[in-house]
Amino acid sequence: MANLPILQFEEKIVETVEKNSVVVIIGETGSGKSTQLSQILHRHGYTKSGVIAITQPRRVAAVSVARRVAQELDVPLGEDVGYAIRFEDRTTSKTRIKYLTDGVLLRESLSNPMLDDYSVIILDEAHERSLNTDILLGLVKRLVRIRASNFKVLITSATLDGEKVSEFFSGCPVLNVPGKLYPVEILYSKERPVSYIESSLKVAIDIHVREPEGDILIFMTGQDDIEKLVSRLEEKVRSLAEGSCMDAIIYPLHGSLPPEMQVRVFSPPPPNCRRFIVSTNIAETSLTVDGVVYVIDSGYVKQRQYNPSSGMFSLDVIQISKVQANQRAGRAGRTRPGKCYRLYPLAVYRDDFLDATIPEIQRTSLAGSVLYLKSLDLPDIDILKFDFLDAPSSESLEDALKQLYFIDAIDENGAITRIGRTMSDLPLEPSLSRTLIEANETGCLSQALTVVAMLSAETTLLPARSKPSEKKRKHDEDSNLPNGSGYGDHIQLLQIFESWDRTNYDPVWCKENGMQVRGMVFVKDVRRQLCQIMQKISKDRLEVGADGRKSSSRDDYRKLRKALCVGNANQIAERMLRHNGYRTLSFQSQLVQVHPSSVLSADNDGMMPNYVVYHELISTTRPFMRNVCAVDMAWVAPIKRKIEKLNVRKLSGGPAPSFKVPEEKTELSKNNAETPAVSENVESRIEAARERFLARKGQK
């Protein structure tokens, strides 16, 4: 700790903070800014008048850095030093240094808009430009004006454009803290490899066999790539002749790992042993692993993108930016001179890579953020004129307003509703919050809590969800898991949790059915916390258990599907008349298909349900709806009329929308463009016929 570069600047930092409300600190990776800034300010009395909050874009970083600071101060984690992430709070009234995700701090501001528990807020890793951090920048800018006498803000980053942020905060000072970096030799490949996984494997084994000691850090795009490469590395290392090279330990590192597996990478290896660390971009800046001498950079990152005109998400493997490439290379020079093997030519780096990463606010859905800003209900905050460091497009803001209008969170004039305020109390995406509120009204809250918790899981719980269709069919034949009774994936998720609940949460049941034990335990904990939140607004007394370990009935399924329809009013699709393709309703209409992993059933004629809701629209080989559930025409008709009456001009002052409908007719549109309300009795008869058919198929 004594050698960390930032400690040499302690006096200068304290002096600058004392004289200024806002300070930008640019510290190279490994300079110690994440762990030491809070301790520096603590030593100089800033915790006497409040708590020091340090935000992180990633949960993993918030937990690991808090743990490290607690160790350095020799205090129990959760007391003087603690952390808060979604669904987990390890702080007490004694906590003086608090690490938390940027999203948690935003939620705290709903109940305490002045954030007056905090004397200092440090926005760390601001260069990642997460959506929540960008909103916090605008929020703390406002607070600095109001709380200038007792409030300090530090924005810290490894690569941020300091002058741009300084200008945003009216010319605040920028301090540069150099890191302790050794020279790093950059080695480029002659061309892009056909497979960056196989190329990474070859380079890693060559280093292991030929190069002197030093750990190897390999950057992959995501968990799937990491698991494939870890498996291949283990296989290759075992095949090496005994005594031909040193021993090896191979560690994966990504956000979905349990904490006890994440912290392993910080333990030094045994003597004469090399560590292979296969990581996502979390190891670029958020976490520093000592001992790395060799870096293998695939040149790719997996990035979630959102198209506001179609409402479609895509998880794309894209090229990294120059800033990211430089950060990755720098990880090799932390302890001694190192090498970075770039699996791409110099020309690609020079000509193809963007200079910096596109901010998340310009490539994601803003519905949750707009609801948050509206729920603050502050007269000086206008969502369309909010002070962003980089403003989102007007199309993205209008899309967010439309989404919120369809689920009743705002009215036709763009004002937040009573339902919208209740939704903002829940730490969930808007569609899930709205589903819970509707379930509370229709009498299926217990079931909805289960489904929402299952959808909030950090990883894919069901192995079949990510399998190709042929493998999935084989898995389905072998599986004893419930099948959703023909209604689709949400009902299956409910049935799975209820089956596990009836075993008293036996981990053996999870393993026997191919379920992730850790993921299911997470779901149980999330459900319990959501249940506690919903107690405040529930009509009836809630029980955390799944209805006394009883299975839900078909009437429960019907109520749940209706609640899902209301909560996902902007995520409804209508089947085409002559085939099982669907078209989306609430966005610019487009043809989509049910994802092959879905358990949604066709009827006796091979036709899928007329209407479905989906949790997510993704683009892979083609547009797919994922997590799909059948809903009834009677529930869809009023939503469709609301869509057709939408006037974006009233919501935001923007241009009126236009919805393009494919020429091929759908079930609802074939008879009448202006659809009357559908009788519940008629719908019930259709439902009864469908249930008789499903019973014949043995799906009850």
Curated annotation (Swiss-Prot):
Enzyme Commission code(s) on record:
3.6.4.13
For the biological process aspect of GO, one term held by this record is: mRNA processing
Keyword Nucleotide-binding found: yes
UniProt domain Helicase ATP-binding: residue ranges:
14-178
Which PROSITE patterns does the record cross-reference, listed alphabetically? DEAH_ATP_HELICASE, HELICASE_ATP_BIND_1, HELICASE_CTER
A Pfam family per the record: HA2_C
Q: Which Gene3D superfamilies match?
A: 1.20.120.1080, P-loop containing nucleotide triphosphate hydrolases (3.40.50.300)
Q: Where is this motif: DEAH box?
A: 124-127
What chemistry does it catalyse, as a reaction equation?
Answer: ATP + H2O = ADP + phosphate + H(+)
UniProt signal peptide? none
Q: Which residues form a coiled coil?
A: none
Q: Which amino acids does the record list as binding ATP?
A: G27, E28, T29, G30, S31, G32, K33, S34
Where is the PTM N-acetylalanine found along the chain? A2
Enzymatic class = hydrolase
Q: Family per UniProt?
A: Belongs to the DEAD box helicase family. DEAH subfamily. PRP22 sub-subfamily.
This protein is called what? Probable pre-mRNA-splicing factor ATP-dependent RNA helicase DEAH4
Whose protein is this, by species? Arabidopsis thaliana (Mouse-ear cress)
